[in-house]
Amino acid sequence: MGRLLRLEVENFKSYRGHQIIGPFEDFTSIIGPNGAGKSNLMDAISFVLGVKSSHLRSTNVKELIYRGKILQRDNTDFTDSSNPTTAYVKLMYELDNGEQREYKRAITPSGATEYKIDEEIVTFSEYCGSLQKENILVRARNFLVFQGDVETIASQSPLELSKLVEQISGSLEYKSEYDKSKDEQDKAVNLSAHSFNKKRGINAELRQYQEQKTEAERYQSQKEKRDSAQLVYLLWKLFHLEKSISSNMAEVTRLKADSIQLIERRDENTKEIEKLKEKEGSIRRNLLAFDRKVRKQEKLIASKRPELISIAEKALESKSNLRKIQRKAAEIEKDYSDQASTLQVLENQLTSLSAAEKEFLKDMQEKEQLKGLRLLPEDKEEYEGLRSEADKLNSNLLFKLQTLNRNIKVTSQSKDSLTSIVGDLESKIKSLHESVSSLDTERADLLAKINEKIESLELEKHDQQKKRLTYSELFHKTQELNEELQSCLQKILEASADRNESKQDAKKREALYALKRIYPEVKGRIIDLCTPTQKKYESAIAAALGKNFDAIVVETQAVAKECIDYIKEQRIGIMTFFPMDTIAASPVNQKFRGTHKGARLAIDVLNFESEYERVMISAVGNTLICDSMTVARDLSYNKRLNAKTVTLEGTVIHKTGLITGGSSNNRSAKHWDDHDFDLLTQTKDRLMHQIGEIEYQKSSCVITESDTVKLHSLESEISLLKDKYTVVSRSVEDKKKEIGHYESLIKEKQPHLSELEMELRNFVKSRDELQIQVEKVEEKIFSGFCKRIGISDIHTYDEIHRTFTQSFTQKQLEFTKQKSLLENRISFEKQRVSDTRLRLERMHKFIEKDQESIDNYEQNREALESEVATAEAELELLKEDFASENSKTEKILLAASEKKLVGKRLVSELTKLSGNITLLESEIDRYVSEWHAILRKCKLEDIDVPLREGSLTSIPIDDVSNSGDITMGEEPSEPVINFEKFGVEVDYDELDEELRNDGSESMASVLQEKLREYSEELDQMSPNLRAIERLETVETRLAKLDEEFAAARKAAKNAKERFNAVKQKRLQKFQAAFSHISEQIDPIYKELTKSPAFPLGGTAYLTLDDLDEPYLGGIKFHAMPPMKRFRDMDQLSGGEKTMAALALLFAIHSYQPSPFFVLDEIDAALDQTNVTKIANYIRQHASSGFQFVVISLKNQLFSKSEALVGIYRDQQENSSRTLSINLEGYVE
């Protein structure tokens, strides 16, 4: 193989000007710093070898021309105004024979590329062909690996790998031819299959027509039998129809004669009922007037009751307050009375004390004079001298006596004080016992009041809870009714959107409601009493009813007249009434039933109660509802039926032929929706009435402010009473404790009192002894004095004088003390009485004020009660008058009811007779129609019926209206019946005696069964009567298809052979490459991955998804590094993937290898060990026939190369520059 010698570039990418790069040895490494232009060198090699610019990191070739700035010496850069507009890359290649060849690719100023071989311009195809001869495949790019291609190959899908092998093998060039021949084969095969299927279908059709020929012959024989049986059945049917018509006509004549008598009796009874109705109408008007007055009076009473309840509640509250104030005033008055009594007692006591004091002074003066205690001055002087002498003699005794008297006095005072204390304690105990007794009584009263108030509170709570429960129930019920009302209002709102009711219509509707309330005999509008059987008939029925649509149905003519008078009085407008007792209704013409399958009588598509049948017949008559305008025109204009026809859209064809109406102006059909709207309105009124009643009931269950105040008042009173009860109970307990304390004090002081009494007795005894001694001395000294002044002894004088003086002083002191106490007590009690009187006066003012309010409330209540009583009395009188008038109505109604029963019985009998007549006439009409229909069928189907007279040609093809055949006047006594035969007399001689005598259903079933059997056999045959003609046509087509099938089969065979030839070429090419790559991949991978530790290396192999046509499927690449289990490629590490991808690249390159292999940084993702392995592999396989050019940044790789091309950046020129060195002369 040849080899790459050097490159010459000029103005290509980062290489400015003309530069020579090389020479390139068997293993040349391109090194240099990042950004120096290594990859641009790779792009230059790719460019000169014909690779598209899109693979060279550019969108067009002009971008490959050098563009750069030149740095000047003064460190300023400028753009060269003469930027190059052309560029080229030249590759010097040495052939096997040593001859050199020059490949050059240039970029012209226009942006085009120019290819030259040895400076001779060639085409791209010639250029690529020359390179291909040297195994340099431009499209497969088997000579280079771009930066990142290794990682891309490692992550390729099986289909992408298969496509890569196709490119390498050259089988891809057969793809378009393969696809084209495959399409041609598929089309040819499909055409052949289609021809075969057509031939098979024609064969089946041929067999079918052969079978149909036999079937047609058998069908003709069976048809003759069926026609014979049909003729017998039709003759039997015609015979018995004529027989039934004759017998029914005789029966109709008899029944109509009977009905005349019933009509006369019915008319007499109706006149009597009319008279009663006139009376009833007058009384009913009076009842209506009374009813208005009663309602007005009830409304008046109802309006007064809330005010009456309010006044009663206020009066009750005022009375409660008054009772409280009165109780408080009574307590204050009692206190005032007690205080006044106490004051009076105290004043009486003061008066008595003053009188006693005066009496005492007077008494003391008298006693002093009586006892002679007053001495003369000289006697008194003598007495004083003698007393001084005696005192000197008795000084020691007197000292002792004074000491004893002092002790007696002290002891006596202590005893008196202690006695007083005990007395006070006893008095307090007595007072406390009285207070405890009073408090116990008060506590019992309080407890009774508390229980009474609690009972009242519980009763009030129970009443309020009952009100709450009732209110809650009514509230929930109101909610439910409101929800239902809301739903109803929503429906009314939705219906109102599509409803356009005029004021006049609304007025009429309200008038109808009023008439129904006044007159029970008012049944309602015709529209409300009937509904179409299906919604599609609504417009048609509305048009059929016409002006009778809003007509009102009443029981009698008398009621109708009263209703007319009412609407005249109210000025409502025009309204039509149908009295049920006098309405005239002609029977429905039965012949119209079955006239056309697309038409039916209007009366037959209405649902209504049986009692309204005559009304409905009178309203719609013989009107026919037609499915379409075509049917309506056919019946009205072609068949000339004497009846009104209406289409489903509401278009009316009148008897006169005039056409009116239609869906555009027929709004009457919406009145059925109006009926639903009326029901919704009635429901709304009912719900609102119920809600109003509940709201009225709720008003009586509402807990008013007075109820709350009353409850709080009771609770407050109970709380106060309980507090007072607690205070009283605590006071009782305190007083009992105080009694116990006082009793214990008395027990403590009693022993001390006894001791003082004993001590006092001893002192008195000692004093008496000393006193005797003193008296003896004094008797000696005062003996002469006593005799002179006339006293027995001096001791008596001294005792009387001393006692009198002491008694006077002590008594006078007691009077002063008691007077002071009474005066202070009186002053205090006077102040208390004054304060209590003021409180009492205020209470009396409050009582007067509340009493005045109560009197006002009572007056108002009595006035309202009087008004209510008067109104209720008037209401009772009105009700009595109403009842009186109602009793008159009931009597009239009873009499009218009896007459109505008679009338109903007569009407029932007449209806029964009319029904029988109608039924018989309907049967006659049906029999006649059926007789005509049979003959019409015979005429249309060419059935040869034997005739004695006439011809079937006289029978009209279209059905004829029975309005001229069977008619009724106003009374059933005027029958006009005619059986039109059109001059035809059927000959029944062929009908045997048994069939003439037996007209039963069983005979009909036998004849029909026999006819049905023949018909079913004929129906099952379904012969093709043109089978013989079609058989010849099919045979001709079959011969033609045989020729087409042979040609299609031959074309399919040729297409398949062409396809197999292309397929085989593509398969051989692909299989050759795959087999080679598959054989090489494992040893190459082993060589790349082996090491001293793992001398065998790893394992790699390829598998095909599709063994028959492998290029249609994928190729799976499996690699197992040394000493590792099998894994998918995406589970290998980055280095393992790179090694596997390189092994695959080397294996692919080994198939039709190019003379040189350019690799761009394939070692980027490898560690040092794997880089060394790659370097060793390249070193071992680099030779004169297999040249490696490697771009690398790792010294483990480029250090193994034979030559180095260094690339650096010339900053001054702003261009990439190269340096080359041969390493063969250097020792490793």
Swiss-Prot record:
- Which segments constitute the SMC hinge domain? 522-635
Q: Where in the cell is it found?
A: Nucleus; Chromosome
Keyword flag DNA-binding: no
Coiled coil residues, start to end: 197-510, 710-783, 814-926, 984-1068
Keywords from the named record: ATP-binding, Cell cycle, Cell division, Chromosome, Coiled coil, Mitosis, Nucleotide-binding, Nucleus
- A Gene Ontology molecular function term of the record: ATP hydrolysis activity
Q: Which domain of life is it from?
A: Eukaryota
Which residues are noted in the entry as ATP-binding?
32-39
The question of whether Cell cycle is a record keyword is answered with yes
Where is it found, in Gene Ontology cellular component terms?
Answer: chromosome; cohesin complex; condensed chromosome, centromeric region; meiotic cohesin complex; mitotic cohesin complex; nucleus
Q: Name one GO biological process term.
A: chromatin looping
Q: Which Pfam families match?
A: SMC_hinge, SMC_N
Principal subcellular localization: nucleus
Q: What role does this protein play?
A: Involved in chromosome cohesion during cell cycle and in DNA repair. Central component of cohesin complex. The cohesin complex is required for the cohesion of sister chromatids after DNA replication. The cohesin complex apparently forms a large proteinaceous ring within which sister chromatids can be trapped. At anaphase, the complex is cleaved and dissociates from chromatin, allowing sister chromatids to segregate.
Please quote what the entry notes about the protein's domains.
The flexible SMC hinge domain, which separates the large intramolecular coiled coil regions, allows the heterotypic interaction with the corresponding domain of psm3, forming a V-shaped heterodimer. The two heads of the heterodimer are then connected by different ends of the cleavable rad21 protein, forming a ring structure.
What is the protein's quaternary organization? Cohesin complexes are composed of the psm1/smc1 and psm3/smc3 heterodimer attached via their SMC hinge domain, rad21/scc1 which link them, and psc3/scc3, which interacts with rad21.
Q: Give the family from UniProt.
A: Belongs to the SMC family. SMC1 subfamily.
Q: What is this protein called?
A: Structural maintenance of chromosomes protein 1
- Species of origin reads Schizosaccharomyces pombe (strain 972 / ATCC 24843) (Fission yeast)
Name of the encoding gene: psm1
